[in-house]
């Protein structure tokens, strides 16, 4: 792990990982938390899942770790009151904690003393998943999660993994957003997420879901308390006998913004470099710019791209663009996701959100 401190100003940081099973970009935490959650986990076909626990402080952090499989919730005795020494990193291989060959594996990390940062490293080796991913956990539950890049495409499979670590069953609405008028829009799917369990929603089973791209917004219907759930999206993109798996933690409540940054840039030349979700009832306009020696300059042809109300737009970033920070500005609050090349001529995409500027700035049309 690395700690980056920016003195006298503000900045954006993310991590680029090169792996033989696929390169990925992962967001960095801007603060520690006393709790971390991972909805999706997978050790099927001897796939490797590791939870990475970082304590950047000069005092020890004490945590309780539990996990949920398709059959039960487990709280291993050796992971209760687990001590993370000061200024240290500990990696837990989930197969060594009694979770080998599990197709469903959600993890909770709760600190009883101190705070920490928790991430997840995944190397998928079979049972429909191949590739590598690295991501932060969710540092809090949320009553809403948004995903810009829903895909119903030949060869792809898409699954929403919902983890409810609370003691109360949750009723959820799953809304699919594709810019259709009210006459053609889909009714929200209603899903019950039982307390302490993982719920899987295969979007291929949603009746009437049209082919193509759509956004997804998952919200809790009950107002019992301020708790919520954690939701991740798993997409397997298949070409022939090859598969590329991506896992994305959604954007939580309050993450929509008019300005988003991608510090490490995008994969230029892809037809689906960026996907922008506009969940508002108002049409917006998006401009994609690059940061360089001359400052922030709009990319030719990517000025004022219309984004339909309650819709998504897929943006192709031109080939030949040098790798540097990209800034996405919108006249309405949006959620922005990047789809990145996995490198090594591997099929599929790596998926990661851009970074929202919060509170959301005012951006003129």
Stretches with model-predicted labels:
Residues 1-3, 72-102, 106, 181-211, ...:
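Intrinsically disordered, low-complexity Pro/Gly/Ser/Thr-rich segments with frequent PxxP/GP/PP motifs
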Residues 3-4, 35, 327, 364:
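Extracellular/secretory-pathway and virion-surface proteins
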Residues 7, 110-114, 219-223, 331-333:
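Beta-strand-rich extracellular modules
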Residues 10-56, 115-165, 225-281, 289, ...:
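Conserved functional hotspot residues at active sites or interaction interfaces
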Residues 53-75, 111, 159-182, 273-296:
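Short acidic, flexible loop segments centered on an aromatic residue
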Residues 67, 73-153:
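Solenoidal tandem-repeat scaffolds enriched in leucines and small polar residues
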Residues 91-106, 133-140, 149-164, 175, ...:
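Extended non-catalytic domains of envelope/secretory-pathway proteins
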Residues 222-223, 283, 290-313, 320-352:
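C-terminal beta-sandwich/jelly-roll accessory domains of carbohydrate-active enzymes
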């Amino acid at each position: 792990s690395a700690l980056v401190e920016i003195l006298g100003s503000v900045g954006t940081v993310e991590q680029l990982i090169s792996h033989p099973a696929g390169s990925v970009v992962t967001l960095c935490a801007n603060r520690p938390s006393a709790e971390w959650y991972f909805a999706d986990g997978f050790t099927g076909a001897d796939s490797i899942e590791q939870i990475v626990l970082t304590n950047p402080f000069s005092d020890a952090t004490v945590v309780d770790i539990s996990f949920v499989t398709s059959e039960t919730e487990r709280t291993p005795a050796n992971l209760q009151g687990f001590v993370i020494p000061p200024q240290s990193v500990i990696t837990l291989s989930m197969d060594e904690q009694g979770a080998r060959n599990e197709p469903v594996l959600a993890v909770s990390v709760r600190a009883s003393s101190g705070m920490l940062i928790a991430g997840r490293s995944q190397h998928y080796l079979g049972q429909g998943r191949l590739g590598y991913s690295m991501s932060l956990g969710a540092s809090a539950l949320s009553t809403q999660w948004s995903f810009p890049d829903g895909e119903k495409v030949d060869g792809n499979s898409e699954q929403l993994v919902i983890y409810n670590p609370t003691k109360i069953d949750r009723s959820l609405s799953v809304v699919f957003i594709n810019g259709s008028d009210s006459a053609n829009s889909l009714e929200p799917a209603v899903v019950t997420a039982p307390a302490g369990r993982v719920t899987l929603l295969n979007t291929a089973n949603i009746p009437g879901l049209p082919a193509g791209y759509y956004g997804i917004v998952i919200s809790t219907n009950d107002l019992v308390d301020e708790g919520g759930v954690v939701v991740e999206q798993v997409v397997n993109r298949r070409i022939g006998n090859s598969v590329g798996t991506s896992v994305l933690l959604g954007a939580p409540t309050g993450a929509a913004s008019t300005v988003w940054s991608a510090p490490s840039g995008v994969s230029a030349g892809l037809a689906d470099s960026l996907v922008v979700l506009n969940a508002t009832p108002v049409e917006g306009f998006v401009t994609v710019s690059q940061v360089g020696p001359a400052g922030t300059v709009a990319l030719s042809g990517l000025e004022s791209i219309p984004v339909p109300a309650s819709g998504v737009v897929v943006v192709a970033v031109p080939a030949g663009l040098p790798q540097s920070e990209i800034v996405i500005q919108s006249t309405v609050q949006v959620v922005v996701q990047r789809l990145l090349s996995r490198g090594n001529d591997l099929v599929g995409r790596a998926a990661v959100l851009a970074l929202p500027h919060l509170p959301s700035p005012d951006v003129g049309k």
